[in-house]
Amino acid sequence: MSQKTNENVERYTQFLQKPQKPIQPYICSTLNDFQEERDFLANNIFPQLNELCNSWGTYFKAVDLSWSALKAPKSLPTHLFRQYSCLRSQRLKLCLDYVNSCFPFFICMLGQTYGDFLPDYSHFMTSKVTRLSSLSKVENLYVAAKNGYPWVLENPSCSLTEFEIIQAAFLNESQFQYFYFRTGTTLLKALDDEKKGERLPSSSSTNEEETLRIGKLKAKIISKGLPVRFYSDLHELGELVFKDWSVVIEKLHPATLMIENIDYKHSFERFYHEEFTEKCKQMCVISKESDRTFEILEKFALKDVELDFNNVAADSSLDSVPRFFRINPTPTYKSILLLSREHGCGKSTLIANWVNYFKKKHPSMLLIPHFVGSTCESSYIMSVIHYFITELQYRNYGTQLETDILNEDSDGLVFSFLVEVFIASISLKPCILVLDGIEELIGIYGISGQKVKDFSWLPHSLSPHCKFIMSTVSSSLSYKSLCARPDVRTVELISTGDEETKLNIFRKHLSIPMMDPFEQSTQALRKKPDLSPLKLTILANELKEYRINHNEFQCMKEYLEAVSVQELWELVLKRWIEDYSWTFQPKRANSDTVASGEGLDSWVADALCLLCLSHGGLAEDELLQLLDMLGYRNHYKVTALHWAAFRNATKQWVQEKPNGLLYFWHQSLSAVEHKLLGVITPVESSPCSFQTPMNHKKTHFHQVLIRYFQRQTSFWRVYQELPWHMKMSGCLRGLCGFLSSPTITDFISKIQSLGFWTRLHLIHFWNVLLEAGYDVSEAYLLSVAKIKADQCHTMRKSGTLSVLQCRLIELTVLDKCRLMFFIGSFLKFMGKTNEAEELFLSVEDMLVQSQSMTDMLLKVQNAIGELYLETGMTQEGFQYFQKAWSSMLRLSLSDLEDSRDLVKQKVRVLDNLAKSASEEYLKENHILEYATEISNLLDNNPRDQATMKYIEGVLMFVAGNTSLAKMKLRECLNIRKSLFGKKNMLVGEVMEFLADLLFFPQRDSKKSQRKQVLKYYKQVIKIKENAETLAKSSLLRKQLSISLSDTLCKLAGHLLASDSCHHVMIEAVGYLYRSVDLRVIHLGSSHSSIHGIHGILHLLREIEWIRSRRYWPQGMSQQHSEGSRNGFSLWEHLVKLNYHSAQSSNTVSSAMCMNADKLHRARRMDLAPQTISDKSKCAPGKGKKKPIICISAEEKIQRKTQNNAEIWNGSGKEASKKKTDYSSNILSLGKMNGLIKLSRQRILLAKSESGEGEITTIYHHPLPWPVSTKNPGESEFISEKWLFHSPDYISISQKSFLQRRLHIETKLLKTSNDINKE
């Protein structure tokens, strides 16, 4: 590939590997004279910096506490005075807390004022302070000193601004701090009288001291060498700030760039887990118990044999183990370790820290952690499995995370297939998977929660390469189900440790130095020995905040009386609301969803409810805007300052993701739902919960969120939240309109690589609508009509209209085609094949008429051909692949060097041609040479590599190099198995081709090869059966059934060709009957392939004759004397039974077609050193070995006139071969009876449907030469798509046909009964 492409890929890979942390500078200035600058930066410069950060996968958010917005007590309502006093008393502490949380980023603006300060410290006596809320704005430095900043008392005369600068720049050092000094002697904005009145009494001496102080402060900043900029107006300030912080962004994120229109959900998910691990690391308290747990986990992860528990620790014994944990001692190989504790015992923190520990100690080991509940997507079982798959394949193949192989295959959205891919992925190389909190897993897309949590989907045995570490609570369904598995080792953590460990946990989270009354708190803790780490963490965090405005000992006493974690959370929520919140009085009678008299408690309660009900979390500005919508405005407005105080108090529990969205850090905060929403059932449990009267409040919040996100301009935020709330509130009509709207379709269709989460939820929401009676095709076709009629042409100005208000403007032909093609592709996936075909053809028409010969035309023609191919219209499909080939030739190879998508499209065209084109076409157009050139342009994507090997295998076979073709196909099979497992149709495709290659040239084939063919055919049948049950389109199900019939016949033919013993014949008969059943059901009696029934039954009659002779009373002597005759007679009918398909195309995709001279060339090549032995060209049996004679479609057409005389000599035998794997249990007489009865019913039904008294049989063609054992290698290969097809017709009596069928069935049953009696 070109150097430019390689550079882009390298930069992209660096972006994926490096977490992008947000940039959040703290804004510092004197309070009253920089409001204009703050507003200018917030409205003009910071949004630009945020856009720049977005291009690097992160965000920019300045933290401006805006104390000037806090109104004086006299202007506040009486019931708000308490909140004002509490906030005012902790002003300095709050500022210093945020300086620390924003470190290392800091922006400071200084002018000619110094800010409020105490000129005479002697009047400030902290010992006389009785009510903290009564302190002045300056005197509240006592609160800061008591809560972590004792150094402020050493400098009591400093202003608030200088305190912030000391904390940011003098007590800490950072290269990301910038100071902006305003020049001039006048302020940009005059101070109003009210603000002047808040200042301390002014005098000339005070003004002089203030001027002196600000001068000294600036001199200290400059002398320390901190970066200082000077500005004279707003424009100059904006330029300086943008230039400085653009450099910061580029310095922190070098050489990383997000590719436009790529869905980066997986990358962000990955960062979230890393961030979660880092936060847990900060809270971990190391103890002897944690060290011993680490050792157990490490030994389990590294060893393939049972742990020697006597050596868990050098100084430990088994007697001491139960003090901390209990281990299931079953002495068998274990692949799963289940760590269990009750809620709040620190499992997640312990595991996250072990992950950090293990990665540092064993950096070469592949360890992938996943913490359920860390994001909204992390709880869905399919997202969890997909996350593991993507990470494993990225580590093994280097595939780009957002363009992984599953994004190219709709099978990846089927749960059973996804599990198969997962099993294949963990078998690639040694790996350690960590899944924390499995009791929180939930189902989606038709997967029930019970199935998810009981782990019935997980195979009974995992690959020995994989070690799986899980954690859950002991009372969960997951724990009970996994304990029943023999490959699970359980480690139950039953103790937090000794008393000192508990106190260390408490101290860790309290983190307040010089706290004198701490010992009194520890005495209270010692009286409660059953405190879990979660309770200790809650108590410590609450004590830090509660003690500012309350009696801390009363707080401790009240909290310790709580019996459960939920009761404790209810007390905490009550305290939060009392200290930080207020409500307002206006009636809400307009609400059509809230019951009469039902009010909202307070803004804190409302904010927590909104956060709880959101799908992916909410940003701070979103929450503040939502509160404004709920009525908190004017005097009741929740300012950024009020919000900052609340967030500072709850930062341990309401945390921020790397993308800036807030979420509940611990699952125990579900108490919010129970306490504030009055809901017992989890949010995700039922989309119909809105119908329950007791959930009216919950439904109301969902509707508020709907109204809010309908007005938003960010597509990803709208797509993540709006459809979710529409579903949860029962607004299904709106959901249908949203998903099918041209605007949303336009956004989604522009994404180059639609991520797994995006596709999964789109399909999930449509499934909800389908269950409610909505028609997906009707909704989308209405949008198509609007697109064609140019009814979406409203002008959009960036950032001024919401996503739903946007209209597509001046759609070009290519735009319309892109939209319609996306809709067609989605309808095809949803099983609406006819509508998809119509749209594809319409798009092709539009592109051809507009002479837009772009890569889109290539993509559309390829899609049409694939649709035809999948529904059995092979010839029509081939015509479109020819068109795609012509379009492809218009693109030079140099055009492909910078377009990975174009290379993929060309690979798909070649793949489809190999499946549908004739041998002559492939040779005349030099497809093999072109495929060789394309293969040199492929990247390291294993899916594309496997497809190319398949193409080369087919083309090399056509060229006559059978041995090399087999080698390529085996390579393709191995890659696809490692990618998709054993049940994917792509695996079945190449497996059947290989089986055909190995089966048809049966001369002196080895026994092992015959077994391999049998195994392949049976596996292909299972794959097709599974695919048929999951297919959404009736046309696709029909074609899969017909294809299954072909494979069943192939298997029967292989069985009969390999062996003629009794049980093999019985099994083959079952496959043949089932093949007939499938054809009668899906094709009807008039289809040409149905006429092969007579040929099959003619073969069955011969089988019955052999079996009846074999079991004469004379026994084995009779059988021995007839052995030679039996083998010859069976082979005589077997070789006369041509292998045809219901298809009418002349292809070489999954089987072989060569005439005699081609076969001779292939045979000569087989004798070469690098080729396979020509023993594989003959089918041995108990008698004389006979070749299988086959002829091409062209030869069949040429011999039309000869077919009538040969009709009885064999029609359905190759079809019989295709009945590969009905079941090995077909030997059961009961099943045989049912099968025969079913076949009889199908034939009678076919008779009634046809309205005729005869069945026409088309089959047999004369053999091109006499069958002779002297020419064992002169057989031909033919395509699977030729099975059951011939152009000739002849009529036979339906009555005699049925009589013979009944006669054979009766004899088979009689013989089987005799055998059972013996």
UniProtKB/Swiss-Prot annotation:
Database matches in SUPFAM superfamilies: P-loop containing nucleoside triphosphate hydrolases
GO CC term (a single one): cytoplasm
UniProt cross-references to InterPro entries, sorted A to Z: DCAF12, P-loop_NTPase, TPR-like_helical_dom_sf
Source superkingdom: Eukaryota
Principal subcellular localization: cytoplasm
Keywords: Cytoplasm, Repeat, TPR repeat
Chain coiled-coil ranges: none
TPR repeat locations: 399-432, 653-684, 817-850, 858-891, 991-1027, 1045-1082
Annotated compartments: Cytoplasm
Official protein name in the record: Putative tetratricopeptide repeat protein 41
Source organism: Homo sapiens (Human)
Gene designation: TTC41P
